[in-house]
Amino acid sequence: MKGKVYLVGAGPGDAGLLTLRGAELLRRADVVVYDSLVNRELLALAPESTEMIFGGKRPRERAIPQEELNRLLAEKAVAGKTVVRLKGGDPYIFGRGGEEAAELRREGVPFEVVPGISSIIAVPSYAGIPLTHRDHCSSFTVITGHEDPDKDKSALDWDRIAREPGTKVLLMGVEHIGKIAAALETNGLSADTPAAMIRWGTTGRQQTITATVGTLADELAKADFKAPVVTVIGRVSTLCDTLNWFENRPLFGQRVVVTRTRAEAGKLSGQLRDLGAEVLEIPTIRIVPPTSNAPIIESITGIGNYDWIIFTSANGVEHFFDYFFKAFRDVRDLGCVRFAAVGPATAKKLRELHINIDLIPETYTAKAAAKALLDFQNLENVSVLLARAEAANTELPRLLEDQGAIVDDIAFYKTVPETADRNGAAEEFETYGADWITFASGSSVRNFDARFGLANRCADYPDLKLASIGPETTKALKELDLKPTVEAREHTVDGLAAVLVKK
């Protein structure tokens, strides 16, 4: 059966601007062919089995020649694959999507075009520049500064463009900005016309500088701006200082590494992005089944013998009930057991299953959990099931046993080091570094150190800051002779995000 090619616009850079249709197609892609300006965070939406092919497309960057790329798309589809051709912005706006579609039609390959949000409108918006405004202009013109180099003559009518009222938006014009400004001036546009240049628009690296047509080239050189840059020419560019919302957020300009598992990173990453940070998701752990499930089966079979089940993580809740419902159909088979949850995320997971929680310690540590349980009742001969990770810290079961409890410490899952870099974030970190690294568990500290040499990196980059979610994580950092820059007062994801803002 013949496959299909989807020409998908990835948007201008902010991963949140991908369309719902684009996200849906990535989730079922067999092959993804992506360009340089695509936010590689989007690649993580695809299944782990998806073949990833880098197409290049940046100036002076190694790329698959367009003709070869066209053939590749057709070949993969003919082989029965679902192919997503992921292109920055919109496929049909200065993206050669039309050429790719034409080749697919010639080859008889089915295709679909999924429009994307173009940098033409998105980047000025993120810089506080409306392209139209009742007080300034009612139209805008879009210009490419990078025409086909094989053309004998420019297709751009500079006389008409200069005289055209309204805003002018220039894409891909960095290398020729001096010539473009001169052409506009020569054809009648005032050298005093306001202008703005936005680099890496809609991303955490966004920078905006203002100028006039006459000073564009000088200001560009001073700022050492390199592609990608969107240039806006016209009176609306004067509004950027007043209307700029994106660059005014508390963590703007900060690159923050999130080390949680891919499944768990979403909430923290989302909060940090909302606060303006550029987030690099580098999972350090992956959740896998435990070494043996025999102890699990034994504990589930005898579930009615326990007085308490203690969960220390949402993962523990999830994996416990996965096993439980394989053995039982009815939650009432839990009997009269009581539930304790360490931390609000753990409690939330239990409540999602409509489980009433009998005990939540005020602080989220082993010592606090043991004390809370002891305050609740005498623990002599009380039977406790600890449903948690393999090789977890032994402090909690030891403290409970010291008070006479009978503890079964059962591993319902195991964490292993994550080494894959599906979204390119690890490569980005290695190349450009970061301002912050956030840690939400001791294992994330140890695995990050094993992969990147955390202690050495902190020594080499003294401005690198470390954020810990709580005492157990801080303890793991101290074992490496490292001290966190900040520790969350509330030992939750919310607390971790909040402490970065306060710092």
Please place each PLM-identified region on the residue numbering.
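A glycine- and small-aliphatic-rich helix-loop capping segment at beta-alpha/alpha-beta transitions
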Residues: 23, 99-111, 128-134, 186, ...
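Short, charged beta->alpha transition segments
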Residues: 40, 69-76, 126-130, 154-158, ...
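Conserved beta-alpha
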Residues: 49, 113-124, 139-151, 175, ...
